[in-house]
Design a protein with these regions (language model features):
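Vicinal oxygen chelate
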Residues: 2-7, 14-42, 59-64, 88-98, ...
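Conserved beta-strand in the GNAT
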Residues: 10-12, 72, 147-149
Length: 167
């Protein structure tokens, strides 16, 4: 793990097979009990794409939420002790209008989170479309902050590709 003042990057050099689609997920969250987290995700509406498997430092699983949002859940054999960040990043999730409500409902249930705001007319400049508006939902939970950007998917580069940011 590489830690910067504003985030971490995980790098692994696996010498064993890696279950597909591990590695294609947009984000990951550290959990304290893998079995409970997977069960909670499943009962909250997630599909378990990759059941828990051992990695060099713990266990991982991949779940998918409404809208196709793939998320890694991971657990460490020895709990990590990271220095506090100078700035806390937000997880950015892009979803369609068709999936937004289901995604937010299910993820909030899983994370015991709270919808902090739901702005139906957020400024389009935030997604590279300055003359328009879009729906932006902000969620907070024990996993941190998440911004859900509800779009039609027709975004100019690099919007829609970033997975983290800062308010």
């Amino acid at each position: 793990v590489i830690q910067t003042p504003v985030g971490t990057i995980s790098l692994f050099g696996y010498t064993t097979p890696i279950p597909y689609p591990f590695g294609s997920e947009r984000t990951g969250y550290l959990v304290t009990d893998m079995n409970a987290a997977v069960a909670s995700a499943r009962t909250s509406g997630a599909e378990v794409l990759v059941s828990p498997f051992a990695d060099p430092i713990g266990r991982d699983a991949i779940v998918a939420w409404p809208g196709g949002i793939e998320m890694q859940l991971y657990w460490h054999t020895t709990a990590p002790h990271y220095a506090p960040f100078e700035a806390i990043p937000e997880n950015r999730v892009y979803v369609s209008a068709d999936a937004a409500d289901a995604f937010v409902r299910d993820f909030v249930r899983f994370s015991h989170g709270t919808v902090e705001s739901d702005d139906a007319r957020a400024p389009g400049i935030e997604i590279g479309r300055p003359d328009e508006t879009y729906r932006r939902i902000r969620v907070t939970s024990g996993f941190g902050r998440m911004t859900v950007l509800v779009t039609d998917g027709q975004l100019p580069y690099p919007y829609g590709r970033e997975t983290t940011g800062y308010e």
